[in-house]
Swiss-Prot record:
It comes from Ehrlichia chaffeensis (strain ATCC CRL-10679 / Arkansas). It comes from the Bacteria. It is a multi-pass membrane protein. Its main location: membrane. This is NADH-quinone oxidoreductase subunit H.
């Protein structure tokens, strides 16, 4: 191989690396801006429900309020409790924030269509379109509890430790139900690639969508518990635990927890859109709606689910802890197990398993 070819290969490698780096930076910036304006949206929606105005001073209609809040958090004094484990105390919010961002690596925001040998090949727009995208995102979401446990233990506070224990047991309990709901989707699509799942779901008959609808409801409610959102925000119950596992945090460490929590909230709604609501495709497969880019539909669906999260926070009272655990283990777990068996049986009986009928995924990637 000549030096010229080696130089061309090196330039190609540098170019692909630069493109990947730009993708990563773009996703991180987009998530951070989304978190900032999700907080603004939450305050505005709750204010409207409670017949208030909400943020309306900083900028037109209060649109610059998120930046004012960010400046306030940055310039606040950073206090470390005297008897805390200082290293773990500082590492915990970094773990939570980092894991919240890592999950976005496999999320497809849309897709490009290219023609190859007469076929229209659909290429999902994701940082990494890996073969085990579902397993990756489940693993990343499961690791998030470590940051909370470390924060509660290292703070040397009874309130923080109790909040961390609550959060750990709650997240572990509802991850089982979330995993089983995703299993039903995998049975119907036969793929662990998030992009293939979206397109396979798009090409399925409507009766399979109706069959998976109860699992979508369980996934959505379990997502509230998984992200410690109302009415399952027991780890952060202000009336019981002051603020929960992050009670001793201030300034940027608190901001990292805050960013991680809301980034996880957006992420799990993006997962719901991918698994149950058609991803980047327009609703009901209406032809003229395809004029609108897929990423716009994806964002609109995620925003709609986030609005439901906020609406629930403003209207439904908090569960007791025993009710929370009972709902997860005594209601959602048996129903999820039963529905996995039911979906498997119906797919086998109707000869609709992906192993027997490949048209969904093959049509997905070679349309």
């Amino acid at each position: 191989m000549s030096y010229y070819n080696i130089f061309l290969d090196f330039l190609s490698y540098i170019g692909s690396g630069a493109a990947l780096f730009i993708k990563i930076i773009a996703v991180i910036i987009s998530v951070m801006i989304s978190v900032a304006y999700l907080v603004y949206m939450e305050r505005k929606v709750i204010a409207a429900i409670q017949l208030r105005q909400g943020p309306n001073v900083v900028g037109p209609f209060g649109l610059l309020q998120p930046f004012a809040d960010a400046v306030k958090l940055i310039i606040k004094e950073h206090i470390i409790p005297f008897k805390s484990n200082k290293i773990c105390f500082l590492i915990a919010p970094i773990i939570t924030f980092t894991l919240a961002l890592l999950g976005w690596a496999v999320i497809p925001f849309g897709a490009d269509v290219i023609v190859n040998d007469g076929y229209e090949v659909i290429i999902p727009n994701a940082i990494a379109n890996i073969n085990i995208g579902v397993l990756y995102i489940l693993a990343i979401s499961s690791l998030g509890v470590y940051g909370i446990i470390i924060a509660g233990w290292s703070s040397n506070s009874n309130y923080a430790f109790l909040g961390a224990i609550r959060s750990a047991s709650q997240m572990i309990s509802y991850e089982v139900s979330i995993g089983l709901t995703i299993v039903t989707v995998l049975l119907a699509t036969g793929s662990l690639k998030l992009g293939e799942i979206v397109v396979a779901r798009h090409n399925m008959p409507y009766w399979i969508d109706l069959l998976l609808l109860p699992m979508a409801c369980i996934f959505f409610i379990s997502a509230l518990a998984e992200t410690n959102r109302h009415p399952f925000d027991l780890p952060e119950a202000e009336s019981e635990l002051v603020s929960g596992y992050n009670v001793e945090y201030s300034s940027m460490p608190f901001a990292l927890f805050f960013l991680g929590e809301y980034a996880n909230m957006i992420l799990i709604n993006a997962m719901a859109v991918i698994f149950f609501f058609g991803g980047w495709y327009p609703p009901l497969n209406i032809g003229f709606l395809y004029i609108i880019p897929g990423i716009v539909w994806f964002v609109l669906k995620v925003v709609a689910l986030l609005f439901c999260f906020i609406w629930i926070r403003a209207t439904i009272p908090r569960y007791r802890y025993d009710q929370l655990m009972g709902l997860g283990w005594k209601v959602f777990l048996p129903i999820s197990l039963l529905w996995v068996v039911l979906v498997s049986s119906i797919l086998v009986y109707t000869d609709s398993l992906p192993s027997n009928n490949k048209q969904y995924v093959s049509h997905a990637m070679h349309k």
